[in-house]
Swiss-Prot record:
It comes from Pseudoalteromonas carrageenovora. InterPro entries: Quinoprotein_ADH-like_sf, WD40/YVTN_repeat-like_dom_sf. The gene is cglA. This is Lambda-carrageenase. Residues 1-25 form the signal peptide. Monomer.
């Protein structure tokens, strides 16, 4: 924990190499303060320097700034995210203390000078909300989170009272599958509400599901054990914002709340606490007047608009100014280019403070709503700092790429299939790419609101569960002939087609017979059938595999078609190792199945890439895929700030995965002009797409999965409920742990694979993982009792680069424990075994040509006889920053090290280490010339 105090204004000289003015001209309606960090929450309060802005950053650093831009101090706290901060004076000195509800399970109290006052915490379950409530002359700190308790804490940090939600909650459970206990909840928000007589009450917003329930209000008298009132919430979906306002200035607070949702469900509400009445307004009513897609949190304050009190709602990149009617149809709408993480009203000045832009911004913005030009100033606001830098860094790469020529020594680029790009947004760019390059390949993608209505009674006579399943999003109206005509037409004047062909809700949207006919009509052109969220258990699902998926895969393998299995959660490192999926693992259908992911709500991205690549390296499949959607950042569905308008995070995600060998890309078509840089990098050969036998950044140590432990399999795929925490059960160590809905942003445990193998420290968004000692694959078992019988995939080393032939080391797990090959010895996840694995990863990393540390993601592949291609990527998914990649050469001697785009050269020091800068939001492609062809070297000489 570090604190830095600054006594004078800090010049904003960013690591990105440019100097940004700290504050805009004083006469402007908007002033911007550079922080050099991605600011996710803002508050205001009185510090020794006067009224000040309090910020918390993506990584949990709390800092204070004067309104003139002077930085007062910062405190790094735990290094984990703060789910909530609250600012209030608790000791009567006129200066505020700052309270942070941290994902490490603690509440931190920070003094007004930035020093730590106290820490409160009973476990490592994330704290989610914190506030202060007054009762006459007493003040209490109140906090709660995912352990389902509400805590009263003294102003000195001592526990005064614990209130278990099970003593008063009315939250119900619903749906199929394993469900948590009913009548319990997690604390989504806790806030004080003031009355005109000076008294306060405590409002707790409790919920048990991050996606499908808005929860309830529970209203307490200060320090009471039970609520005096309860109320349902009038809007649907998880609530992402709750705050108090006083619209009519009568001294009695009202509550404004907004949900965390996509546009179809987006809504705001205001609650009168006198009678618990609520007014609501559906933002979807004005969807045509705002940008429709994206996942946003609606945040509502009250401002004076031309002398009239008005509700101001920040909704992504839009501000809605709504009159007293609270009807958004009457709103004035202000549009900016970017979306912002948070908004706070400073009551002493009536100014609004915006947190950083979600696309990688680093500034906070102060809006003076008393300035007549503030509306136009907001619409014209162009954040500087990191956001400007990452866009300039992208443009610099584009300029360098225009002069790049692929070395003649390298083979032709492998085809990379973009299976869902929109030809409507930038058709000429796609046409140009198709004219100039053989790769990437763009398929004709069809969305299917209407699907086949076929007679399932005979084919599925013995499977009534799936015979009767339907997806509510689809209209079952087409005949087989109509379905055929609609899709087969896509082959005309194209390289192939792609479409949703089914879903976990209904795998049979298109009958097997019709789909075979469609594929045949393509005459060998590529067909990709997308199957999202395929997950099932028991005899009924086994029949789906044997009657539909495996026969379709056999037919596909003979007709240049693929099944793009877009599964969720931990499927590729848990469910895939269940007995019913043995045929996919066997390798007999390797050219048909493409493992892919839909990783919204997930917090285990570093594992999923290791799982997909493990099946690929093992020979179970010949290809693997990746997907980007607007809600990829939605690891916490209760706070879906997933409206990034510059998809730099997505660009880096896709580049890292393609550099790792992914060749089937399922992107949501958004800002394709920006994303098209990836197409050009592939087409010109700057982004090297490796075969699996060319990769050299894989650790020789791999974790092999036997049939998954049933509790691990179930809990790691059950992520929407927030109330599964059980102290006794959660104390049991697992190799893959803290994966259900209880743990957003939580720290990973030392014995967890994510921690010791991937260097992933939190359950959040590691889409671009570091793996500093080499990517540790999660694979099928290679030897011993748990090895699959009757496979044709060969051994792992058979499919990998020749250097791996005699250096591989396998450790076997079921997700909970470790096992020796004969199954006679079982070792707990937190036993000495994990330390042995960690040490072995370190030891074996010296056998790799190189390893990379320093917060940059990396991939190495052999690109030619005596050349290696090193791809370096800024790993900060939503908080990009300058990185320094420390490249350590181990088993090779570099002759020359050159950036293939910029031409910059590098030389290692006497320890064989070279430091290569990676700019914020950027990536580099480095050619390393070596003395020998690694394919001819014996592993014993490495």
């Amino acid at each position: 924990m570090k604190i830095k105090i600054l006594s004078a204004m800090v010049a904003s000289s960013l690591l990105i190499g440019c100097v940004i003015p700290t504050v805009k001209a004083s006469q402007s309606a908007i002033k911007s303060i550079e922080t050099n960090r991605t600011i996710t929450k803002v508050r205001t309060g009185m510090l020794s320097g006067g009224s000040s802005i309090i910020t918390t950053s993506y990584e949990g650093t709390v800092a204070a700034y004067k309104f003139n831009g002077e930085k007062l101090w910062e405190n790094e706290l735990s290094g984990f995210m703060n789910h909530d901060i609250w600012v209030q004076d608790i000791n009567g000195d006129g200066l505020v203390e700052i309270f942070a509800a941290n994902a490490d399970g603690n509440v931190y109290c920070i003094n007004s000078d930035g020093s730590l006052k106290w820490t409160f915490g009973l476990n490592e379950v994330p704290m989610n909300s914190v506030t202060v409530i007054s009762d006459a002359d007493k003040k209490y700190v109140v906090a709660g989170g995912y352990d389902k308790n509400l805590y009263y804490i003294s102003t000195n940090g001592e526990l005064l009272k614990t209130i278990e939600s099970g003593t008063y909650s009315e939250e119900g459970v619903f749906g199929d599958g394993v469900k948590p206990e009913a009548r319990t909840h997690t604390v989504n928000f806790v806030r004080p509400v003031k009355s005109s007589d000076g008294t306060e009450k405590l409002v707790v917003l409790g919920t048990n599901n991050s996606l499908q329930s808005s929860g309830r209000f529970y209203i307490f008298e200060p320090f009471a054990d039970l609520p005096s009132e309860k109320s349902r919430i009038s809007i649907k979906k998880g609530i992402g914002d709750l705050r108090t306002v006083d619209f009519d200035n009568d001294g009695n607070d009202e509550l404004t709340l907004g949900n965390s949702a996509q546009i179809g469900d987006a809504a705001i509400s205001v609650m009168n606490l006198d009678d618990l009445s609520q007014k609501k307004s559906q933002i979807n009513d004005i969807a045509r007047r705002i940008d429709r897609f994206g996942y946003r949190v609606a945040q509502t304050e009250v401002v004076m608009n031309e002398g009239t009190p008005t509700y101001l709602t920040l909704f992504g990149s839009r501000i809605l100014l709504t009159p007293e009617s609270f009807d958004v149809n009457d709103s004035e709408i202000l549009a900016n280019k970017y979306s912002y993480y948070d908004m706070w009203k400073d009551k002493s000045s009536n100014k609004l403070v915006l947190a950083s832009a979600q696309s990688g911004g680093s500034q906070v913005h102060i809006i003076d709503t008393s300035n007549p030009s503030w509306k136009s100033a907001y619409e014209e606001l162009e954040p500087q700092g990191k956001l400007a830098a990452i866009q300039e860094n992208t443009r610099a790469i584009e300029r360098q790429l225009s002069n790049f020529q692929k070395p003649t020594r390298e083979r032709a680029p492998l085809p990379v299939y973009f299976i869902s790009e929109s030809r409507n947004e930038i058709p000429t760019t796609i046409e140009r790419s198709e004219f100039l390059y053989d790769s990437p390949v763009f398929l004709n993608y069809s969305t299917l609101p209407n699907v086949e209505n076929w007679d399932r009674s005979e084919v599925l006579a013995d499977n009534p569960k799936y015979r009767d399943k339907r997806d509510r999003r689809k209209n079952y109206t087409l005949s087989s002939e109509e379905m055929f005509n609609k899709l087969s037409a896509g082959y005309d004047n194209s390289d192939g087609i792609s479409q949703w062909a089914g879903h976990g809700n209904d795998p049979y949207m298109i009958s097997l017979a019709t789909m075979k006919r469609i594929i045949s009509s393509g005459d060998g052109k590529k067909t990709v059938n997308i199957y999202p969220e395929i997950e099932g258990h028991g005899d009924a699902f086994n029949k789906v595999l044997s009657d539909h998926f495996y026969p379709l895969a056999e037919f596909s393998s003979e007709n240049n078609a693929n099944l793009f299995m877009r599964n969720k959660h931990t499927f590729w490192q848990s469910t895939i190792y269940a007995p019913e999926w043995s045929e996919l693992r066997s390798g007999r259908l390797a050219d048909a199945f493409v493992p892919a992911m839909e990783e919204t709500t997930d917090k285990s991205m570093e594992m999923s890439v290791a799982g997909r690549m493990g099946l690929w390296a093992a020979g179970s499949v010949d290809n693997w895929g990746e997907r980007y959607a607007r809600d990829n950042p939605s690891f916490d569905r209760l706070r879906q700030h997933s409206h990034q308008m510059v998809p730099n995070h997505a660009l880096r995600q896709i580049i890292y995965k393609i550099a790792s060998g992914a060749r089937y890309i399922n992107n949501f078509g958004f800002n394709q002009e920006y994303m098209s840089l990836a197409w050009e990098l592939i087409g010109k050969g700057a982004l090297y797409v490796p075969k699996r036998e060319e990769l050299l950044s894989l650790s020789p140590v791999h974790i092999s999965m036997k049939e998954p432990d049933p509790i691990y399999r179930e809990t790691s795929n059950n992520v929407k409920w927030t109330t599964f925490y059980d102290e006794e059960k959660d104390s049991i160590p697992y190799v893959f742990s803290r994966l259900n809905g209880t743990w957003p942003g939580a720290k990973t445990l030392p014995w967890d694979y994510s921690n010791y193998a991937a260097d992933t420290k939190e359950r959040r968004l590691d889409f671009i993982p570091k793996f500093p000692k080499g990517l540790v694959l999660i694979t099928p078992v290679q030897q011993g009792k748990f090895k699959d019988e009757g496979t044709v995939r060969g051994t792992l080393a058979d499919n990998m680069h020749p250097i791996y032939k005699d250096i591989m080391k396998e450790y076997i797990t079921d997700g909970k424990n470790y096992y020796n090959p004969n199954g006679e010895q079982v070792m707990a996840a937190d036993s000495v075994r994990y330390r042995q694995i960690k040490n072995k990863i370190e030891e074996k990393s010296n056998l790799l040509p190189m390893t990379v540390s320093g917060e940059a993601a990396w991939v190495v592949a052999q690109s030619a006889e005596k050349h290696l291609r090193l791809t370096l990527v800024d790993s900060g998914y939503l908080n990009p920053s300058n990185k320094v990649a420390k490249v350590k050469f181990n088993s090779v001697t570099p002759v020359a090290i050159v950036d293939v785009l910029s031409g910059e050269t590098f030389s290692p020091d006497s320890n064989g280490v070279v430091e290569i800068p990676v700019l914020a939001g950027a990536f580099r492609f480095i050619d390393v010339k070596i003395t020998e062809d690694l394919r001819n070297m014996q592993s014993s000489t490495l």
